[in-house]
Amino acid sequence: MKLVCIECGKSISYDHFSYHCECGGLFDIVQDFHNHDAEQLKHLFNERLSERMTPYASGVWRYKELIFPELPEECIVTKHEGNTGLYTHQLIQDYIGLRQIYVKAQSENPSGSFKDNGMTVAVSHGKSLGYKKFTCTSTGNTSSSLAMYSSIGNSDSYIFVPNKDISMNKVLQTIAYGAHVFSIPGTYDDGIEFLEKYSEDLGLYVCNSINPFRIEGQKSIIYEIAQYLNWNLPDWIVVPGGALSNATALGKGLHDLFTLGLIDKLPRIAIIQAEGASPFHQMIDKKMKELIPDGSPYTRASALNIGNPPSWKKAKHTLKETNGITASVSDIEILNAKAIIDRSGIGCEPASAATVAGLKKLVDQQKIDKGQTALCILTGNILKDTDALKEYHSGDNMVAIFKNTLQATSLDYKTIQNYI
């Protein structure tokens, strides 16, 4: 394993860790898979499905040979993350109009979001280097995940959250896990800039998506999907686009699976952004070479409220390698899609629902054929943003087409009989 700059190609050892190359580029992790046999790996991964109390009970560390083979087992900080549900539901299928749709509920992770898949690897790597203080800037899910893993690993976490346009549910979860939480003026992007400048001097290990070990852990999402589907993936993988680490990780994981011969074709990736925070989609749609940051992004889907996604270059490479596409969706499209996902019994936070909303739009626009198959990644739990539930079902929003209201009634048989 080595770290290679995506800009200039310089490589460094993983135990001489840095987030940025001297040229300013981000590092990517390059693994050597030449000695792996696909059938032996399948057998090993299937055997580990029966693990219960070891690190390999984790839906991330089950694939340790493809994620961080050099890491000593005693350095693994895990809460048996992963192992999340893969579902189909007729309501979602009818809403989108596609032949076959899966949803991967990363919302079932221990802290309630997909961030756990990457955070277990980042914190474990930091521990192996001797770090005791971990940090991130976050609109919510990264912070609660980091706070949880830091506490499990008997370390401290220092979290920077914007002072507006965030979900207080996520902040309260982070506080409850014992993190030192700082409410800052400005945006997620301002927090990233601060940590890039000062984290090393402060002795802090950064766990944002600029950390390539986060990406390695998040690859496990697509590994797990492939294993559950007997190594036969759908035509499309649909993912929400905020910081773009998840899209990057899924693309990298697909490349690994294809290179190893574990799958025989690459699915196409669709990255969905919210209209109010869609600089990556705008770049792709307008065929621009560089991303133009949005200095004042806003979307009700707070996890997508990022105007300068740090992983955009890696995500652009993912689109190129998978012949992928992008789309943007309005907040009301997101919230209506969320209502369908919730009503199916699966549930998710608003940002997750961007995948279903985006897939519906792409099918309606005939960019995805109705005869194809797709899988939507649901990134966060339904309880991550209860304010969104209140606004949708209790507010005066006339375009909330799946509103379900609380009904006040007297407790007598005939009245209840009329409702039923």
Predicted feature descriptions by range:
Residues M1-I420:
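PLP-dependent amino-acid enzyme catalytic core
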